[in-house]
């Protein structure tokens, strides 16, 4: 059963209504379009295609530990947020994997509303910790800092690139 949370983020004179819903597989194409438009722009400048975004989103959504929310204003998709629940020794944590708001709708409170809705849903199921990986910078790291997230003193992100040699066929 889909849960909806109605929100009022615009001025009363705008006559716009918003709602936050659980993400649904039937909307993957719509989510992918938003994902590509946001993450292929500043500050990320990624190179997503609709196809690769759809694969990523659908793969994530099909896991049993997935939890995600979508924000609509006047039936137009404005933002999505999702992660995976993980059991740790001290409770359930969530790895917040993706979070984006339509570029033209950023800095209007939509992201904060979406994050609060996810936090509310996580609280209901006993999630005790949220962690994420993001790019350095005020638009990314700064956004989370302003909402109570802190850099971990005892964790580090490490990567290893090009460890698998690919052969041409």
Regions found by a protein language model. Give the residues of each.
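Conserved GNAT-fold acetyl-CoA-binding loop/helix
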Residues: 36-58
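Conserved active-site alpha-helix within GNAT-family acetyltransferase domains
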Residues: 112, 124, 128, 136-154, ...
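A conserved beta-turn-beta hairpin within the catalytic core of GNAT-like acetyltransferases
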Residues: 86-96, 106, 152-154
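Conserved acetyl-CoA-binding loop-helix of GNAT-fold acetyltransferases
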Residues: 101, 107-120, 146
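A short beta-loop-alpha structural element at the N-terminal edge
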Residues: 15-33
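Conserved beta-strand in the GNAT
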Residues: 70, 76-85, 95, 100
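A short helix-loop-beta-strand connector motif used in the catalytic cores of GNAT acetyltransferases and
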Residues: 58-70
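Conserved hydrophobic beta-strand within the GNAT/NAT acetyltransferase core sheet
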Residues: 96, 130-134
């Amino acid at each position: 059963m889909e849960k909806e949370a109605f929100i009022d983020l615009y001025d009363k004179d705008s006559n716009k209504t918003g709602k936050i819903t659980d993400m649904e597989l039937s909307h993957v194409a719509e989510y992918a379009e938003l994902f590509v438009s946001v993450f292929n722009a500043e500050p990320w400048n990624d190179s997503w295609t609709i196809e690769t975004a759809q694969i990523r989103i659908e793969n994530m959504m099909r896991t049993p530990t997935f939890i995600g929310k979508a924000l609509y204003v006047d039936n137009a998709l404005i933002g999505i947020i999702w992660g995976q629940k993980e059991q740790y020794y001290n409770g359930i944590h969530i790895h917040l994997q993706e979070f984006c708001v339509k570029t033209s709708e950023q800095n209007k409170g939509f992201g904060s509303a979406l994050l609060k809705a996810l936090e509310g849903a996580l609280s209901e199921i006993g999630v005790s910790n949220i962690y994420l990986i993001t790019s350095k910078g005020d638009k990314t790291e700064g956004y989370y800092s302003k909402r109570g997230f802190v850099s971990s003193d005892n964790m580090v992100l490490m990567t290893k690139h090009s460890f698998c040699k690919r052969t041409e066929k």
